Amino acid sequence: MSKNLSIIGAGAWGSALAIALYDNFDTIYLHAHTQDEVKILKPKYSALYPNNIKITCDFSKLQNSKDILIVTPSYAFSEVLEKIKPLISSAHQIAWGTKGFDTTKRCFLYESFERIFPNRNGCVISGPSFAFEVATNKPTALVVASVDKNTRKHFAKLIQTTTIRAYTNADIIGVEIGGSIKNILAIAAGIAAGLGYGINTQAALITRGLAEMSRLGVSLGAKNSTFVGLSGLGDLVLTCSDDLSRNRRFGKELAFNHSIKSALYNIGSTVEGLNTLELILSIANKKQVEMPICEQVYQVTQGKITPTEVVNYLMSREQTNE
């Protein structure tokens, strides 16, 4: 078999990875969701990458690749795994670049993977990475996490390029938590930015948000050290600091007193932080972990408090040790 890669998900992140990785493979099969998407994308890729990137919506093409990378929205993750399961052989290896929780099954993505593929080692690729910068070859560092050493080393080698530096980590729980909670905290950062607060406020939100992320992660068995790495602090700083982040832009829309519906319309794409909010807080409640920033973001999205009241509440909480 030639050295091919199948990427399932032709959105911004899947497309960026295809462009960034095309020199590493003979052929990359970029799987769109529908034939209409194929018709839109095919002329563009045929002109720029005529021999390397093939646009398709035919899952039978998975037979041409040993390695599969899933880059779909988190809500579609389980559905995609179920669809491809009959086509997967022992020769295939699967990783995903999706961040967030499986909200349809109310669990981590790796748990959905283990449920559908019980005898395989899951692998997640995460870290601070705006799709546009990856696609335009800006130097980027990613983390590849799996409980299996060979699996994480395999995918780290596959995605390493002159502009992508891949690190490995055994803590798949911590990496997935970081990639999920940072989206919620970015909404909070967007609210603060939209209200006109300064860098001091942003720094406080990032630092205290990291504490919330770490507390929940450790309660679920993750390593504290993971949260000061690329998938924790790295992705959190990125997502909270720049308007390339959809979640941050969504928070700014809320600060401008736009409704959830109009804010989502203005963003024009998935806001993962909004999708995972309720589930994260449900888990935190069961583990008796305090997450005041995430809780206040949830209250805003439910229309129970205003964006201004979020900051007022957080600043007036009872004093505690750091």
From Swiss-Prot:
<keyword id="KW-0443">Lipid metabolism</keyword>
<dbReference type="InterPro" id="IPR036291">
    <property type="entry name" value="NAD(P)-bd_dom_sf"/>
</dbReference>
<dbReference type="GO" id="GO:0046168">
    <property type="term" value="P:glycerol-3-phosphate catabolic process"/>
</dbReference>
<feature type="binding site">
    <location>
        <position position="13"/>
    </location>
    <ligand>
        <name>NADPH</name>
    </ligand>
</feature>
<dbReference type="InterPro" id="IPR006109">
    <property type="entry name" value="G3P_DH_NAD-dep_C"/>
</dbReference>
<feature type="binding site">
    <location>
        <position position="99"/>
    </location>
    <ligand>
        <name>NADPH</name>
    </ligand>
</feature>
<comment type="pathway">
    <text>Membrane lipid metabolism; glycerophospholipid metabolism.</text>
</comment>
<dbReference type="GO" id="GO:0046167">
    <property type="term" value="P:glycerol-3-phosphate biosynthetic process"/>
</dbReference>
<dbReference type="GO" id="GO:0051287">
    <property type="term" value="F:NAD binding"/>
</dbReference>
<dbReference type="GO" id="GO:0047952">
    <property type="term" value="F:glycerol-3-phosphate dehydrogenase [NAD(P)+] activity"/>
</dbReference>
<keyword id="KW-0444">Lipid biosynthesis</keyword>
<feature type="binding site">
    <location>
        <position position="127"/>
    </location>
    <ligand>
        <name>sn-glycerol 3-phosphate</name>
    </ligand>
</feature>
<keyword id="KW-0547">Nucleotide-binding</keyword>
<protein>
    <recommendedName>
        <fullName>Glycerol-3-phosphate dehydrogenase [NAD(P)+]</fullName>
        <ecNumber>1.1.1.94</ecNumber>
    </recommendedName>
</protein>
<keyword id="KW-0594">Phospholipid biosynthesis</keyword>
<keyword id="KW-0560">Oxidoreductase</keyword>
<dbReference type="GO" id="GO:0046474">
    <property type="term" value="P:glycerophospholipid biosynthetic process"/>
</dbReference>
<comment type="similarity">
    <text>Belongs to the NAD-dependent glycerol-3-phosphate dehydrogenase family.</text>
</comment>
<dbReference type="Pfam" id="PF01210">
    <property type="entry name" value="NAD_Gly3P_dh_N"/>
</dbReference>
<feature type="binding site">
    <location>
        <position position="33"/>
    </location>
    <ligand>
        <name>NADPH</name>
    </ligand>
</feature>
<feature type="binding site">
    <location>
        <position position="246"/>
    </location>
    <ligand>
        <name>sn-glycerol 3-phosphate</name>
    </ligand>
</feature>
<dbReference type="GO" id="GO:0005829">
    <property type="term" value="C:cytosol"/>
</dbReference>
<feature type="binding site">
    <location>
        <position position="129"/>
    </location>
    <ligand>
        <name>sn-glycerol 3-phosphate</name>
    </ligand>
</feature>
<feature type="binding site">
    <location>
        <position position="99"/>
    </location>
    <ligand>
        <name>sn-glycerol 3-phosphate</name>
    </ligand>
</feature>
<dbReference type="InterPro" id="IPR006168">
    <property type="entry name" value="G3P_DH_NAD-dep"/>
</dbReference>
<feature type="binding site">
    <location>
        <position position="246"/>
    </location>
    <ligand>
        <name>NADPH</name>
    </ligand>
</feature>
<dbReference type="Pfam" id="PF07479">
    <property type="entry name" value="NAD_Gly3P_dh_C"/>
</dbReference>
<feature type="binding site">
    <location>
        <position position="182"/>
    </location>
    <ligand>
        <name>sn-glycerol 3-phosphate</name>
    </ligand>
</feature>
<feature type="binding site">
    <location>
        <position position="272"/>
    </location>
    <ligand>
        <name>NADPH</name>
    </ligand>
</feature>
<feature type="binding site">
    <location>
        <position position="247"/>
    </location>
    <ligand>
        <name>sn-glycerol 3-phosphate</name>
    </ligand>
</feature>
<feature type="active site" description="Proton acceptor">
    <location>
        <position position="182"/>
    </location>
</feature>
<keyword id="KW-1208">Phospholipid metabolism</keyword>
<keyword id="KW-0521">NADP</keyword>
<dbReference type="InterPro" id="IPR011128">
    <property type="entry name" value="G3P_DH_NAD-dep_N"/>
</dbReference>
<dbReference type="InterPro" id="IPR013328">
    <property type="entry name" value="6PGD_dom2"/>
</dbReference>
<feature type="binding site">
    <location>
        <position position="131"/>
    </location>
    <ligand>
        <name>NADPH</name>
    </ligand>
</feature>
<comment type="function">
    <text>Catalyzes the reduction of the glycolytic intermediate dihydroxyacetone phosphate (DHAP) to sn-glycerol 3-phosphate (G3P), the key precursor for phospholipid synthesis.</text>
</comment>
<dbReference type="InterPro" id="IPR008927">
    <property type="entry name" value="6-PGluconate_DH-like_C_sf"/>
</dbReference>
<keyword id="KW-0520">NAD</keyword>
<feature type="binding site">
    <location>
        <position position="235"/>
    </location>
    <ligand>
        <name>sn-glycerol 3-phosphate</name>
    </ligand>
</feature>
<dbReference type="GO" id="GO:0005975">
    <property type="term" value="P:carbohydrate metabolic process"/>
</dbReference>
<keyword id="KW-0963">Cytoplasm</keyword>
